[in-house]
């Protein structure tokens, strides 16, 4: 919250010009006076509680004890009442383009029109101040809009960068996953091929053993047959020998 500025020295000439406005500025700047103050930006006059203001601070600014008379004085000097959004009827806010906490040099420009057409002039002054207030509000709103645009642009840049980082990380994750699956598939295929080869080798060994066993059996059979034939020949020969001799 902005600090309220200390009371600035006001020349006697300024006091003679407008004692009411200078007293108003002095009390509004006085940090010990909580019944009337500037807003945070220092460009609007705030009376937080009208009842407390009438009891504690009105007599320091105006000779009247009537709040309506005090408001008329503000209107005569061109102050514009600002409508509150919250509808608090016990709080009043006023604006004047030359009544600013940080620009006491502008106070001398706040004057009361004393011409015959005073009512018209006062209304014009109030109207001009209202336009000035609207222009000030529009400027602030435009500044806020520009600030929001800058923030949105910054957020969009950060979002794009973050999106790119996440996309790259996701893409790398997919690539690693695919590489892992490929290696896993290759390893499985290799193990499967090795298992098949070993199985085929075992089968081949079994078949070889069977073949060798069969061959051995056939050889044994053949040897046995040959042996029988030899025995028969010997027997025949012996018989022949016995017959002739």
Swiss-Prot record:
Keywords of the record: Activator, DNA-binding, Nucleus, Stress response, Transcription, Transcription regulation
Q: What GO molecular functions are on record for this protein? A: DNA-binding transcription factor activity; sequence-specific DNA binding
Region Involved in trimerization: start-end pairs: 130-169
Q: Quick check: keyword DNA-binding in the entry?
A: yes
Q: What is its main location?
A: nucleus
Q: What InterPro entries would the database entry show? A: HSF_DNA-bd (IPR000232), WH-like_DNA-bd_sf (IPR036388), WH_DNA-bd_sf (IPR036390)
Q: Which domain of life is it from?
A: Eukaryota
GO CC annotations, alphabetized: nucleus
Where in or outside the cell it occurs: the entry states: Nucleus
The residues that make up the annotated DNA-binding region are 17-115
The entry sums up its family as follows: Belongs to the HSF family.
Role: DNA-binding transcription factor that specifically binds heat shock promoter elements (HSE) and activates transcription.
> Assembly state and interactors?
Homotrimer. Homotrimerization increases the affinity of HSF1 to DNA.
Q: What name has this protein been given in UniProt?
A: Heat shock transcription factor
């Amino acid at each position: 919250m902005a600090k309220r500025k200390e009371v600035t020295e006001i020349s006697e000439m300024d006091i003679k010009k407008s004692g009411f406005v200078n007293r108003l500025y002095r009390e509004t700047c006085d940090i010990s006076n909580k019944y009337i103050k500037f807003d945070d930006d220092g460009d609007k006059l705030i009376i937080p509680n009208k009842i407390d203001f009438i009891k504690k601070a009105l007599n320091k600014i105006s000779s009247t004890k009537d709040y309506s008379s005090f408001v008329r004085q503000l209107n005569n000097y061109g102050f514009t009442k600002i409508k509150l959004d919250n509808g608090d009827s016990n709080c009043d806010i006023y604006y004047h383009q030359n009544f600013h906490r940080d620009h006491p040099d502008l106070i001398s420009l706040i004057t009361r029109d004393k011409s015959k057409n005073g009512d018209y002039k006062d209304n014009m002054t109030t109207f001009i101040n209202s336009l000035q207030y609207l222009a000030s509000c529009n400027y602030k709103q435009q500044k806020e809009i520009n600030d929001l645009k800058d923030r949105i642009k910054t957020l969009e840049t950060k979002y794009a960068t973050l999106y790119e980082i996440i996309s790259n990380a996701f893409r790398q994750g997919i690539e690693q996953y695919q590489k892992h699956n490929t290696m896993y598939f290759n390893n499985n295929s290799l193990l499967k091929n090795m298992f098949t080869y070993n199985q085929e080798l075992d089968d081949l060994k079994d078949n070889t053993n069977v073949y060798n066993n069969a061959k051995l059996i056939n050889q044994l059979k053949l040897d046995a047959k040959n042996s029988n034939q030899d025995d028969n020949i010997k027997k025949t020969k012996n018989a022949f020998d016995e017959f002739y001799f």
